């Protein structure tokens, strides 16, 4: 996979999101998201084969990068891809993340197809882990509810801004409101 600032290899497999290629939503996030801080705790929620987690680890080698996915094959692939690219990524099942863990940065192409209620629960859980100055960068397909999700996040008192749009995707920045 080649990005403007990085080149790395990764393996995908059937049964894991975006088998055989980097999906256009994730590519948009990786190309357009603001540069991550040099350090902190970063999470890729719904990591799939790990392109987001690997990018975070390569761009911010001093950060603690955690890749989370309920799919065991996705976790295996992410761990193998991190090893192959010589980066440090902690790969875990969501149930094994410590309840008190706070996060400075979330990058995610969240699993929209799990359904509206399940997605809202997932986002409520992970956004609730953001540190006071933490930020989540989410890429959402416009045709799969990006604008309604944006409105819902605002009604839940999150500060949301659209960082960009491309090829039917929205790139959103989500953070805690500050007085």
Language model: regions and residue ranges:
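Short "lid" loop at the C-terminus of a central beta-strand within the Rossmann-like core
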Residues: 112-114, 141-146
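Conserved beta-strand signature within the Rossmann-like core of class I S-adenosyl-L-methionine
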Residues: 133-140
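Class I S-adenosyl-L-methionine
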Residues: 145-179
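Short beta->alpha hinge that forms the Motif I/post-I loop of the SAM-binding pocket
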Residues: 69-73, 118, 141
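A short glycine-rich, Lys/Arg-flanked "PGG" loop and its adjoining helix->strand segment in the class I
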Residues: 120-132
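SAM-dependent Rossmann-like transferase core, predominantly class I methyltransferases
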Residues: 1-39
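Glycine-rich phosphate-binding "P-loop"
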Residues: 105-117
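Conserved SAM/SAH cofactor-binding pocket of Class I
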Residues: 24-108
């Amino acid at each position: 996979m080649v990005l403007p600032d990085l080149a790395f290899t990764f393996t995908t497999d059937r049964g894991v999101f975006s088998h055989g290629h980097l999906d256009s939503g994730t590519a948009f996030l990786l190309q357009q998201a603001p540069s991550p801080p040099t350090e902190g705790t970063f999470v890729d929620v719904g990591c799939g084969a790990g392109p987001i987690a690997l990018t975070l680890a390569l761009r911010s080698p001093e950060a603690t990068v955690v890749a989370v996915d309920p799919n065991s094959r996705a976790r295996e692939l992410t761990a193998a891809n991190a090893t192959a690219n010589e980066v440090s990524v902690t790969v875990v099942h969501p149930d094994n993340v410590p309840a008190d863990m706070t996060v400075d940065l979330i990058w995610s192409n969240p699993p929209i197809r799990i359904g509206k209620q399940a997605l809202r629960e997932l986002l409520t859980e992970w956004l609730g882990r953001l540190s006071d100055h933490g930020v989540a960068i989410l890429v959402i397909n416009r045709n799969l509810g990006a604008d309604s999700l944006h409105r819902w996040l605002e009604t839940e008192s999150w500060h949301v801004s659209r960082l960009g749009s491309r090829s039917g995707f929205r790139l959103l920045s989500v953070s805690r409101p500050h007085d």
